[in-house]
């Protein structure tokens, strides 16, 4: 459009110029004759006009070519910018996905450790003499009793998963072990109904530990191993050990309300051998707990266990049913805690039936080969800021029939006392004295006692 206007303007300019020249010539000559343009002049003017039109056309072509080049350049720049932006967008998407995983995943750990001195004595007659054995080693040393590493991932508001490993080191045995203590998928459908599939906390022991508060100093009474004192092949569990499992493989249903007049419960159907043993058997075991809190600071709970503890296998020997009943009454507020736990068990060690005659625990019916009654009482008081004093006393009476069906007895007494200090929110230290004394079995007198003093600690993150 601009080139056409320019052509018209040039032509008009040339016409006006020619007309002015002719007018001037006419005026100077003062001749009234008519102005005429000869053919040569007209041809010259047409040639000039054609030349100007050619120049305008050439200029227009150059301008259009330049405009096309600018468009191509802009497109190329845009393509480069898009190409440069795409990796950034992909990286951003990957970072968003990673952030989502990180935000919904929690990694933590708990370590129980101690630096103590042990004095262990045992014997069958006379005064016990110093001797290493039954889980005790004389001398001074540092132990990492437990180290739990936990990964917890939340898929959504309902589903989550947990993996907890259990590492322990025993300096007396110079060995380490690593197990999967918890590995479960959880569906939380309501505060009163959560289900877990896999290895998870059992109903009783972890529940008592929360109210006790000093697990890093000592296991609760049903989780404590009573080493030594029993001999013979009737104890399939390898002697008098713990009377329960803190975790096992199976299906677990649990729920709770909060505040005053609240309830809590858990029912677990499990393999029966604990989290360290995935052994399959012909039947499953069950453990349950029900608790009631008239006020938030107090709980009254009962529990029970029944099963073969994984010993009922195909073409195996006949079995008995192991049972355990539990009761807990506890109180805990910001300054004071106290509790009493009681349990009664039958056939906990003697699952497999053995031939034998004579009197003894349930020998006439051939049903009960061992039974135990135990109780534990504890208290603690936070008397100043991070400082607290605590004490605990355990008593166990254990009876069993030996291979000739003669009843034998074991009596175990344990107590500890100490003072604890919360160094940090996640670091606790305690100066503790422990005493354990075992007597029996009476048919072949056997005794041992252990005194231990030192520091116990718990680090969590």
Where do the protein language model's features map onto the residues?
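Outer membrane beta-barrel
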Residues: 95-124, 129-272, 280-287, 291-302, ...
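N-terminal periplasmic/intermembrane-space "pro-region" immediately following the signal or transit peptide
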Residues: 6-7, 12-13, 21-126, 461
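Solvent-exposed loop/turn segments connecting transmembrane beta-strands
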Residues: 168-177, 244-246, 275-283, 317-319, ...
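N-terminal secretory signal peptides that target proteins for export/translocation
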Residues: 1-2
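Outer-membrane beta-barrel pore domains
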Residues: 5, 36, 71, 119-122, ...
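Short linear Ser/Thr-Pro motifs
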Residues: 17-20, 257
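A general secondary-structure boundary signal
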Residues: 32, 45, 52, 59-67, ...
């Amino acid at each position: 459009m601009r080139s056409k206007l320019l052509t018209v303007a040039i032509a008009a300019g040339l016409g006006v110029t020619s007309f002015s020249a002719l007018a001037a010539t006419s005026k100077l000559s003062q001749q009234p004759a008519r102005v005429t343009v000869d053919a040569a002049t007209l041809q010259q003017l047409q040639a000039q006009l054609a030349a100007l039109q050619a120049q305008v056309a050439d200029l227009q072509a150059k301008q259009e070519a330049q405009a096309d080049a600018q468009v191509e350049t802009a497109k190329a720049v845009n393509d480069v910018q898009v190409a440069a932006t795409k990796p950034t967008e992909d990286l951003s998407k990957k970072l968003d996905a990673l952030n989502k995983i990180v935000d919904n995943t929690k990694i933590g750990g708990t370590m129980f450790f101690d630096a103590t001195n042990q004095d262990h004595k045992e014997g069958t007659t006379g005064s016990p003499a110093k001797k290493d054995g039954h889980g005790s080693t004389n001398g001074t040393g540092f132990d990492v009793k437990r180290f739990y590493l936990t990964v917890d991932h939340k898929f959504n508001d309902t589903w989550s998963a947990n993996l907890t490993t259990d590492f322990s080191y025993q300096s007396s045995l110079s060995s380490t072990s690593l197990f999967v203590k918890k590995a479960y998928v959880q569906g939380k459908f309501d505060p009163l109904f959560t289900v877990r599939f896999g290895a998870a906390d059992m109903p009783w022991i972890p529940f008592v530990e929360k109210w006790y508060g000093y697990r890093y100093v000592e296991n609760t009474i049903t989780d404590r191993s009573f080493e030594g004192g029993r001999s013979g092949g009737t104890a399939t569990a390898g002697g008098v050990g713990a009377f329960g499992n803190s975790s096992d493989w199976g299906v677990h249903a649990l729920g709770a309300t909060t505040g005053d007049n609240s309830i809590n419960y858990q029912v677990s159907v499990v393999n029966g051998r604990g989290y360290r043993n995935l052994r399959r058997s012909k039947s499953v075991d069950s453990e349950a707990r029900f608790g009631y809190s008239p006020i938030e600071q107090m709980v009254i709970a009962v529990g029970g266990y029944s099963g073969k503890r994984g010993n009922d296998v195909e073409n195996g020997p006949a079995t008995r049913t192991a049972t355990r009943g539990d009761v807990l009454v506890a109180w805990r507020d910001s300054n004071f805690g106290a509790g009493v736990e009681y349990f009664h068990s039958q056939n906990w060690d003697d699952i497999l039936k053995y031939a034998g005659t004579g009197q003894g625990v349930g020998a006439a019916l051939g049903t009960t080969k061992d039974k135990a009654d135990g109780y534990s009482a504890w208290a603690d008081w936070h008397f100043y800021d991070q400082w607290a004093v605590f004490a605990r006393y355990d008593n166990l009476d254990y009876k069993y029939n030996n291979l000739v069906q003669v009843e034998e007895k074991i009596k175990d007494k344990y107590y500890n006392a100490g003072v604890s200090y919360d160094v940090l929110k996640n670091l606790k230290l305690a100066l503790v004295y422990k005493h354990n004394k075992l007597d029996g079995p009476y048919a072949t007198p056997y005794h041992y006692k252990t005194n231990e003093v030192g520091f116990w600690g718990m680090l969590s993150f």
